[in-house]
Amino acid sequence: SVPCGRDGFLAVNSTIASIALLAKALFEMTNDDFYSLPNDFLRNNITPLERGKLQNLLKKDTVIVLHGGITTSVAYDLESKFSEVALGNIQLVDFRNFAHGRHYWISTRADETAILMLVGPDENSIAKKTSCILEGKIICESLSICEENVIGLLKMFVDVFQLVSFAGEEHNIDPGCPKVAEFGRKLYHLSYNPCTAPDHRKLKKSI
C-alpha cells in the first residue's frame, strides 16, 4: 500500500507512487541525476495552474494534445483520465505527426476543438513556432516544464492532475469518485487473465 492513502477512481496516488519508486530504483542502479528525487517536492514544486487561462479550452468537445520527449507519458495519462471519466475527447499526437497531416482536423473542426501543448525543454522551439502559426485560428494553450528530468516529469503530472480537476468542475463530475453505472461495475469484476490464455503458436493454428 502507498503511504499517501487509498486511491480514487483515477488512481492518482498510485501513479505518483509508481513514478517515485521506479525513479528511486533507477537512481540506485545508475547514479544518474536524471532520476534523483527531491525531498520536499510537494512543498516547493507545485505551482497552481491559472484556471481562467484554461477555461475556454475545457469548454471544447475535443482537445488535441501535442507532446514529445519527456511529456509523452503525461499525455497518455491525461487521455486516459479524460476518457475514463467522460470529460471530453482527446487526440494524442506528437509535434511531428501533427505537422505532417494531423493538423487537417482543425481546418474543418476548429470551432469545436482546442489544442493543448505539453512542452519540455526539447520541445520549446517547435512549440513556439507551432503556436505562432496557429495564433488566431484556434484556442491553443500550453503546459511547460523547465527540467528534463524526473522532477520535471512529476511537475507535469501534477499540472495534468490540476487540469483534470478543472475539467471535472466544468462538467459537474468528481473525477475521483464518478457515478459508475452498474454494468461498469460488472465489467470491472470480470475475470480475465491473458497470461492463462491458450498460446495459439503452440497449438500450431494457421491464420
Regions found by a protein language model. Name each.
Residues 1-36, 42-207:
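A SIS-like phosphosugar-recognition module
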